[in-house]
Amino acid sequence: MKRPRPTSQPSISSTVKPPLSPPVTPILKQKLHRTGTPKWFPLKLTHTELTLPLTFPTGQTFRWKKTGAIQYSGTIGPHLVSLRQRPGDDAVSYCVHCSTSPKSAELALLDFLNAEISLAELWSDFSKKDPRFGELARHLRGARVLRQDPLECLIQFLCSSNNNIARITKMVDFVSSLGLHLGDIDGFEFHQFPSLDRLSRVSEEEFRKAGFGYRAKYITGTVNALQAKPGGGNEWLLSLRKVELQEAVAALCTLPGVGPKVAACIALFSLDQHSAIPVDTHVWQIATNYLLPDLAGAKLTPKLHGRVAEAFVSKYGEYAGWAQTLLFIAELPAQKTLLQSFSQPINKLDESAEVNETSCDTLKP
């Protein structure tokens, strides 16, 4: 499903914390409006279409923070927003803390959440194809795939290489701090993601001093490569929403530090490539257990990445990436406790079992 991107918001630079070099004075093309007492409004998504703990802390994005019992806050362009769910409330609520326009913030939020895609319809389709998926979905409703800004998603997953979630989050927080400060919530600072121009003024050495290690050269190399693209790097990334998955992945893999797995993550979480399947050793193990038993015991090679992705697409169709996202979430420790209460065991299920366990583990736990 390919959709046009809403009109882009202006890039805004900001003050940078030492030891990074100071940016130029930011120029705001639109006035930011900050609210006083938070006002909450119902979002056009029920809890069965969006469950916050099954969407945000699951490895899709590392820029959203838990700021309440069931509340998450983050930025989308120049908009600082919060989402919350309360026991007994069917609808998810949202609050705009800072924005160029409250109406624009709502539209940007719905776009970010892929709100036009019905989980109920997808889950019904997947369950018909795989009854075991239906059992998982019954317990893990509301796990959505996000539609992030491609540059933001790309930089985040460059930080994810051979890394753990805590360290990735620290790196992403550092990159985010290069953008305009939009506000503080529950002790967390929130910034608009920095522009390509702002990122280009940070050297590899400065990223290394900030603890990025070898990833520093990938970030600076990718930023330079994007800036050299005819028409601009942001436009080039957005153009990958309009091409076939193979072409998008191949294009992303020309960037420093981007391999097939990272490219698939970026494609799935920001480029409308809903059939993208990030493949690593964890996904390989699950695939050989349940989808490709003839390859059990074989070593994962670049050539076999395609076979794994094809197996998921063959099973679940053009939105296979959404199915794999839920199956990955089922692997998270917080969810395993719930799933172990099922009448059917989770591990080593045969073809007649009603519950399946599959992983889209793009990160080290």
Swiss-Prot record:
A GO cellular component entry from the record: nucleus
Catalyses which reaction(s): 2'-deoxyribonucleotide-(2'-deoxyribose 5'-phosphate)-2'-deoxyribonucleotide-DNA = a 3'-end 2'-deoxyribonucleotide-(2,3-dehydro-2,3-deoxyribose 5'-phosphate)-DNA + a 5'-end 5'-phospho-2'-deoxyribonucleoside-DNA + H(+)
Localisation: Nucleus
Active site residues of this protein: 261 (schiff-base intermediate with dna)
Assigned EC number: 3.2.2.-, 4.2.99.18
Record-level GO BP terms: base-excision repair; DNA repair; nucleotide-excision repair
Phenotype of null mutants: No visible phenotype under normal growth conditions or UV-A irradiation stress.
Protein name from the UniProt record: N-glycosylase/DNA lyase OGG1
A GO molecular function held by the record: class I DNA-(apurinic or apyrimidinic site) endonuclease activity
InterPro entries: DNA_glycosylase, HhH-GPD_domain, HhH_base_excis_C, OGG_N, Oxidative_DNA_repair_enzyme
Tissue: Expressed in stems, roots, rosette and cauline leaves, flowers and seeds.
Superkingdom of source: Eukaryota
Function: Involved in repair of DNA damaged by oxidation by incising DNA at 8-oxoG residues. Excises 7,8-dihydro-8-oxoguanine and 2,6-diamino-4-hydroxy-5-N-methylformamidopyrimidine (Fapy) from damaged DNA. Has a beta-lyase activity that nicks DNA 3' to the lesion.
Annotated region described as Disordered, given as residue ranges: 1-24
Spans traversing the lipid bilayer: none
Annotated positions binding DNA: 162, 167, 215, 282
